[in-house]
Amino acid sequence: MSHMMSACGVICSECPAYLATAKGSAHQQLTVDAWRRIYGLSETAENISCGGCLGPDEDLFHTSGRCLARRCCRRHGFNSCAECPKESCQDLERAQSLWDEVPHIGSTLSPADFEAYARAYCGHRSRLSAARASGRDPRPSVPAKNEEKGGQPTSEHDGLKPAR
C-alpha cells in the first residue's frame, strides 16, 4: 500500500481509524477497545470512521474536521504542510503536539499493539521535514477548497503558494 500522509505528517494509510474503516465495524470496535486501553479514549466505533485527513469532510474521523493545519492545506491546495513556504506555524505545531507523546506510550505496549495502534503516529515531525526537504509529498493532490464562510481569510497562511 502506498503511504498517505496527513497535513501534519501522520501516516493516514497506517492509522488504526483509517484501516478499521476499510475493514468494517468489527475492526472499528477492536480499535475503540484498544484506544480505550492504550490512550484512555472513550470513542465509539461509529466515531472512528475515517477516509484520510485530507479527504472530504464527511469521510473524516470526527476530530480531524477541526484541525487547523488540515483546513489550511485544503484552502491552499497543499497536499501537506510540507508544501507550505512557512517554516513553522501555530496551526501545524498544535496538530503535531497531539502525537508527541505516542512514542513514549509505545514503549509500554506489546510489539503487536505498537504496530497496530501507535506506529502510524510516530515520527510525524521528521516525516514532514523529510518531505519538505525532498520537495516531494507522498500524497495525491487535493483540490483547494476554502471551508470557511464566504471564503474569507482565516489563517496566517492565506495567500501562500506551495514552496517548490
Identify the meaning behind each predicted range:
Residues 1-160, 164:
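Cysteine-centered metal-binding/redox modules
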